[in-house]
Curated annotation (Swiss-Prot):
InterPro entries: Ribosomal_mL40, Ribosomal_mL40_metazoa/plant. Component of the mitochondrial ribosome large subunit (39S) which comprises a 16S rRNA and about 50 distinct proteins. This is Large ribosomal subunit protein mL40. The gene is Mrpl40. One of its GO terms (biological process) is mitochondrial translation. It comes from Mus musculus (Mouse).
Length: 206
């Protein structure tokens, strides 16, 4: 009798939309359904199947470790050969002392003549440098005077005159040549022998 009364009270208190067997599901999924626009996924959809553990043979594992230790010892004993830099190595034929040019001893008159010639050459180059410097200074002064006169005549022409000339850079120059070029010269396409040395380093395989 008491049990029937309790069941009737429970049926009266529960909501009409309540379906048997869904109460537990609502309680369990409330933390997942925060938004109605969100994707309603369940916990099993975010999970992945358990991976099967591989059985490792202790003997194979120990054999692999031994092979690795043996390879390391082999590398420590025989270090790799460094590739030589041929540009920094002087050929043996150039180290022969018999090919050295003996030092010439000049007479006092010849030494004096060379010293005077060097002084005259230094004086000539100094005068040439001063002449070039004076010519550049006079050209700059004339250019500045012409710009000032142009500025008084027309501001637009002055603005165009002081603009940077983009055709000056990059600067390309050819010559002077030691010999005059030969017109209609075709360079011969001959054969050549490649004597570049190729070095191979031994790699130890696992």
């Amino acid at each position: 009798m008491a049990t029937g009364v309790m069941l009737c009270a429970a049926r009266a208190l529960r909501p009409r939309s309540w379906i048997p067997g869904t109460c537990q599901a609502h309680v369990r999924h409330t933390h997942q359904r925060a938004s109605l626009l969100a994707f309603w996924d369940l916990i099993p959809m975010r999970a992945e199947p358990l991976r099967k553990k591989k059985k490792v043979d202790p003997r194979k594992d120990q054999a692999a470790k031994d092979r690795l230790k043996k390879r390391i010892r082999k590398l420590e004993k025989a270090s790799q050969e460094l590739i030589p830099i041929e540009d920094f190595i002087t050929p043996v034929r150039f180290l022969d002392k018999s090919r050295q040019r003996p030092q010439e001893e000049h007479s006092p008159e010849e030494s004096e003549r060379r010293a005077l010639l060097l002084k005259r050459w230094a004086l000539f180059k100094q005068q040439e440098h001063e002449m070039e410097r004076d010519a550049i200074r006079s050209m700059l002064e004339a250019q500045q005077e012409a710009l000032e006169e142009l500025k008084l005549e027309s501001a637009e022409l002055y603005a165009e005159a002081i603009k940077r000339d983009t055709s000056l850079f990059p600067f390309e120059k050819e010559g002077p040549h030691y010999t005059p070029p030969i017109s209609n010269y075709q360079a011969p396409e001959g054969r050549y022998n490649d004597i570049t040395k190729v070095y191979t380093q031994v790699e130890f395989k696992r």
